[in-house]
């Protein structure tokens, strides 16, 4: 051991300095001077493990406070709060910006989040909605290169085409060959027994991950399920009077996250049920806009999703509802 190192070791390891000063000195070297923990250990005559523990003690005691000067700083804090509050596996909060359009930004964020969890050859189940279709558009290259397979969670071909239509022809895509909603519960039951419908729905219940949109009653005429013609404005008003705040896959939820009881539409839908969806390991909800806050909150407290991609203003509104 060099004479310099012996001198340093006697000085610091012998605790000639108060621990607070030692923490401060280690922090300065690490954050200000950009030294590695090994470099600091060499300089102060301390093992790397001791340096690591001093840095952690500094963070816990408040001696070290890291400030991130970025528009993403608030988003990162909100992600952490959402994960802790609702026990989420994934939380992604995007900055509140005017451009590009929100659904485009949400789609990009959801695509990036899914790229981090999907393994080659796995099966991704997809719900309808503008944000989820934007997600597929931005996942197209990844889906092709990693041979990720796709399956729809609900009937209805039209609402899926803006996303699926962007994929390479070689991509494996299974679509439920039936409408999202049919004229009666009896017709729905007959179609569910058809092997072509049943097999795709069974595949969807075995997916490795799912991405779904969250609709809101407060969207009024902007709601995808209304614009697609699956419900009428009169039905939308009736659902609201019965306590509905939003929907996932056409199933309408109350503020507490439970399905609204007694709605005929729930028996007329063709697709994976909410209970079946809940069995999947990862269910990422993609939604933004303050008018969707209550619907997102319902999905979270009802454990309908365990991942969320949203934007900053919406995240704050959701957390306000939870407080």
Curated annotation (Swiss-Prot):
Residues 37-60 bind DNA. GO terms for molecular function: carbohydrate binding; DNA binding. Keywords: Cytoplasm, DNA-binding, Repressor, Transcription, Transcription regulation. The keyword Amino-acid biosynthesis does not apply. Its main location: cytoplasm. It comes from the Bacteria. It is found in: Cytoplasm. The keyword GTP-binding does not apply. SUPFAM superfamilies: NagB/RpiA/CoA transferase-like. GO terms for cellular component: cytoplasm. InterPro entries: NagB/RpiA_transferase-like (IPR037171), SorC_transcr_regulators (IPR051054), Sugar-bd_dom_put (IPR007324), WH-like_DNA-bd_sf (IPR036388). Inactivated by phosphorylated autoinducer-2 (phospho-AI-2). Phospho-AI-2 acts by binding to LsrR, which is then unable to bind to the promoter regions, allowing the transcription of the target genes. Transcriptional regulator that represses the expression of the lsr operon in the absence of the quorum-sensing signaling molecule autoinducer 2 (AI-2). It also represses the expression of the lsrRK operon. Acts by binding to the intergenic region between the lsr operon and lsrR. In the presence of phosphorylated autoinducer-2 (phospho-AI-2), LsrR is inactivated, leading to the transcription of the genes. PANTHER family: TRANSCRIPTIONAL REGULATOR LSRR (PTHR34294:SF1), TRANSCRIPTIONAL REGULATOR-RELATED (PTHR34294). NCBIfam families: PRK15418.1 (NF011947). Belongs to the SorC transcriptional regulatory family. This is Transcriptional regulator LsrR. It comes from Klebsiella pneumoniae subsp. pneumoniae (strain ATCC 700721 / MGH 78578). The gene is lsrR.
């Amino acid at each position: 051991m060099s004479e310099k190192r012996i001198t340093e070791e006697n000085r610091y390891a012998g605790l000639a300095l108060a621990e607070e000063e030692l923490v401060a000195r280690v922090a300065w070297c690490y954050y200000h001077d950009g030294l590695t923990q090994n470099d600091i250990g060499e300089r102060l005559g301390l093992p790397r493990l001791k340096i690591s523990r001093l840095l952690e003690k500094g963070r816990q005691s408040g001696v070290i406070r890291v400030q991130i000067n970025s528009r993403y700083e608030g988003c990162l804090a909100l992600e952490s709060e959402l994960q802790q509050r609702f026990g989420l596996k994934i939380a992604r909060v995007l900055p509140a910006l005017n451009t590009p359009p929100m659904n485009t930004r949400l789609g990009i964020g959801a695509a990036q989040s899914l790229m981090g969890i999907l393994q080659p050859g796995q099966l991704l189940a997809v719900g309808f909605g503008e944000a989820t279709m934007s997600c597929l558009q931005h996942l197209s290259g990844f889906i092709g290169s990693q041979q990720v397979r796709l399956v729809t969670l609900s009937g209805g071909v039209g609402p899926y085409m803006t996303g699926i239509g962007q994929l390479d022809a070689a991509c494996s895509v299974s679509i439920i060959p039936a409408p999202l909603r049919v004229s009666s519960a009896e017709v729905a039951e007959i179609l569910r027994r058809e092997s072509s419908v049943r097999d795709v729905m069974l595949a969807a219940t075995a997916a490795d991950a799912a991405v779904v949109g969250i609709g809101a009653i407060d969207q009024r005429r902007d709601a995808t399920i209304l614009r697609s013609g699956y419900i009428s404005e009169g039905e939308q008003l009736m659902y609201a009077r019965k306590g509905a705040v939003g929907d996932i896959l056409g199933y309408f939820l109350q503020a507490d996250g439970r399905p609204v009881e007694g709605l005929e539409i729930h028996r007329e839908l063709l697709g994976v049920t909410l209970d079946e969806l809940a069995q999947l390991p990862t269910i990422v909800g993609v939604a933004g806009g303050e008018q969707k806050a209550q619907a997102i909150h319902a999905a979270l407290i009802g454990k309908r999703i365990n991942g969320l991609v949203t934007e900053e203003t919406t995240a704050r509104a959701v957390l306000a509802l939870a407080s």
